[in-house]
């Protein structure tokens, strides 16, 4: 009982009590608002609709049907019990051979079989979160940095920085060219890091992009490859949305550039891919993360580090059987793309009816929604004010662009694949009602002439000042409490 009189934080490490996890962000506050008042069509029809979670529930029925028709794939059924002891016993860090083989084949299939993957280069980890952290531990030391094009997934601040002690240096991208990554932006970020005496060890790209829902074209990927080879830094390509592409242009993996574009000089030892089944197959709870490295030393070291976050053998066993079912996988990927395209069409079409535009996209589980016309002023404070209204009054959890480190106020990521058709229609109706109530402040085809000035002011600030940190110009978002 005496311990209760002591400040509990004094007994803990500085790392765990600090703010490095990144929870002090609107991205996570929106989740808390939903958790406190979740929408339910019957039990809580006025609750908050969760559109801040990039989860793929559009094909869950296909997986459920496969499991029902293949009970022997699970060691927890009468049909599969004979393999229980062999699978439940301790396995080495390499994982089940049949699982690694199945994942390698699936990765090739989601890339149109234009490239093959070596099962012996696959390292497992606890989801893409674990895969990113293990990769970072292998490639960089505390104080080193990775370049990351903005906007980027807020979880990278946790996954790459929190326990590794590295820095993330933003590569500026903006709406003037639909947020496309350029060679000049890469050079500017690299030189800025050098001026600040920060050693850059790598470049992290997300392809397809979260939050943009776009894919990188071949020329951009060639530029990236040339850049990292010239600077002698690592490239980590996050490709966890590779099978969510539902229309042209097609997804091009960095592996294809490495294998096919032989006119580009590049050291294969610098190239690494992070993959997962969470988005493509809708298995976030299975925590299947994959590191695929062309560097033998990284494969060896990552395998040792993966001992802290392995994928259970029961999960490996089930998924090996599923991914080796060629007929199922083929039909699943086709139907998944069809359903994602339909949901994207319905949602963006519904927004367009009230004059809301989104960045043109063809991948992912979300859209990058443009609400700049609804801002009172072209400032980050106005974006936060609008976001709070959307949470509190519209009762929808969307993620503001600032939480993705976007420097242009007014962009929001909206997820549409984690709900049924009815919830989508209710969400669209709420958005329409809100826009119609505020139509007088919307200016059609408004030119955002403030954009260049904002960029200039942000460039003069320290990097930490445009992050969600105690020094951020974005006010620390209080825990949002949505009310009925």
Curated annotation (Swiss-Prot):
Residues carrying N6-(pyridoxal phosphate)lysine: 279
Q: Which residues cross the membrane?
A: none
Q: Name one GO molecular function term.
A: pyridoxal phosphate binding
Highest taxon listed in the record's lineage: Eukaryota
Biological process (GO) annotations held by this record are: amino acid metabolic process; ethylene biosynthetic process; fruit ripening
Q: Which InterPro entries match?
A: Aminotransferase_I/II_large, Ethylene_sulfur-biosynth, NHTrfase_class1_PyrdxlP-BS, PyrdxlP-dep_Trfase, PyrdxlP-dep_Trfase_major, PyrdxlP-dep_Trfase_small
Pfam families per the UniProt record, alphabetical: Aminotran_1_2
Keyword tags = Ethylene biosynthesis, Fruit ripening, Lyase, Pyridoxal phosphate, S-adenosyl-L-methionine
Q: Which cofactor does it need?
A: pyridoxal 5'-phosphate
Question: Which leading EC class covers this enzyme?
Answer: lyase
List its EC numbers.
4.4.1.14
- Give the metabolic or biological pathway: Alkene biosynthesis; ethylene biosynthesis via S-adenosyl-L-methionine; ethylene from S-adenosyl-L-methionine: step 1/2
Q: Which reaction is the catalytic activity of this chain?
A: S-adenosyl-L-methionine = 1-aminocyclopropane-1-carboxylate + S-methyl-5'-thioadenosine + H(+)
Subunit: Homodimer.
Q: What function does the entry list? A: Catalyzes the formation of 1-aminocyclopropane-1-carboxylate, a direct precursor of ethylene in higher plants.
- Identify its protein family: Belongs to the class-I pyridoxal-phosphate-dependent aminotransferase family.
Q: What is this protein called?
A: 1-aminocyclopropane-1-carboxylate synthase
The organism named in the record is Glycine max
Native organism taxonomy: Eukaryota, Viridiplantae, Streptophyta, Embryophyta, Tracheophyta
């Amino acid at each position: 009982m005496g311990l209760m009189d002591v400040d509990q934080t004094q007994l803990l490490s500085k790392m765990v009590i600090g703010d490095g996890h990144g929870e002090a962000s609107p991205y996570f506050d929106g989740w808390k608002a939903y958790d406190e008042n979740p929408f339910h069509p019957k039990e809580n029809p006025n609750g908050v609709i969760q559109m801040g979670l990039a989860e793929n529930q559009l094909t869950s029925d296909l997986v459920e049907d496969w499991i029902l028709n293949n009970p022997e794939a699970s060691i927890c059924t009468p049909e599969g019990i004979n393999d229980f002891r062999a699978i439940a016993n301790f396995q080495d860090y390499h994982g089940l051979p049949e699982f690694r083989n199945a994942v390698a084949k699936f990765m090739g299939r989601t890339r149109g079989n234009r490239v093959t993957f070596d099962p012996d280069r696959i390292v497992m980890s606890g989801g893409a979160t674990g895969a990113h952290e293990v990769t970072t531990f292998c490639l960089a030391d505390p104080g080193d940095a990775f370049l990351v094009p903005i906007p980027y997934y807020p979880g990278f601040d946790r996954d790459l920085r929190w326990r590794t002690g590295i820095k993330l240096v933003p590569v500026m991208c903006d709406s003037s060219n639909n947020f496309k990554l350029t060679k000049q932006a890469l050079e500017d970020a690299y030189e800025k890091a050098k001026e600040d005496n920060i050693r850059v060890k790598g470049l992290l790209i997300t392809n397809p992009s979260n939050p943009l829902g776009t894919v990188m074209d071949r020329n951009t990927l060639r530029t990236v490859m040339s850049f990292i080879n010239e600077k002698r830094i690592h490239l980590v390509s996050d490709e966890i949305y590779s099978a969510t592409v539902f229309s042209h242009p097609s997804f091009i993996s960095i592996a294809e550039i490495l294998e096919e574009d032989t006119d580009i000089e590049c050291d294969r030892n610098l190239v690494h891919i992070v993959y997962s089944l969470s988005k493509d197959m809708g298995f976030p709870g299975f925590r299947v993360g994959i590191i695929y490295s062309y560097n033998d030393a990284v494969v060896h070291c990552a395998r040792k580090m993966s001992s802290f976050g392995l994928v259970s053998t029961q999960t490996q066993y089930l998924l090996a059987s599923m991914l080796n079912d060629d007929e199922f996988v083929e039909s699943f990927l086709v139907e998944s793309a069809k359903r994602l395209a339909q949901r994207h069409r319905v949602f963006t079409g519904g927004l367009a009816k009230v004059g809301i535009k989104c960045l043109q996209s063809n991948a992912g589980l979300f859209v990058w929604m443009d609400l700049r016309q609804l801002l009172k002023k072209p400032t980050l404070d106005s974006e936060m004010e609008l976001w709070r209204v959307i949470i509190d009054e519209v009762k929808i959890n969307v993620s503001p662009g600032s939480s993705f480190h976007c420097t242009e106020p007014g962009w929001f990521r909206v997820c549409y694949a984690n709900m049924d058709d009815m919830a989508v229609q209710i969400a669209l109706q709420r958005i329409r009602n809100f826009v119609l109530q505020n139509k007088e402040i919307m200016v059609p085809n408004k030119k955002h002439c403030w954009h260049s000035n904002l960029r200039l002011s942000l460039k003069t600030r320290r990097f930490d000042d445009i992050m969600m940190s105690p020094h951020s110009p974005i006010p620390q978002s209080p825990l949002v409490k949505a009310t009925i």
